[in-house]
């Protein structure tokens, strides 16, 4: 299912691209630790292609290549760390959703600031398979656009992040984005 990005037009895409390229040029752009060395090398171009002409769906399809991912992942169950083979399709969809939404929110927030808009509303762009209570509590909130812009990735990047920061998307697989009020 595709996300509903209310203002995903050429103007927003252009700002998304500018913001993405600025982070890339900063020397320490975010890269998922789940990506392989090759995945980290090609991710930037895949993201640029999605920003210019695609969506989270086209990005997920581009990422759905086992050579772009570390083959194993660690997870914790009942307090015990374990390893399992990575589900490439699931990992591709999760990263694509989170990254495309992150850049959409960043680009739209910049656009709204440039237009003098002070507040925005958090909304769910699509219905997730499961809803995190922590994420769901933000549905419908009216938020200061500058807070959204300033807290870009603040919960997790740069590491260790600020777990108390308010960021949209709130975390991996979050289906929340913003719109003008």
Regions from the PLM with identified roles:
Residues 1-170, 179-181:
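Domain-core detector
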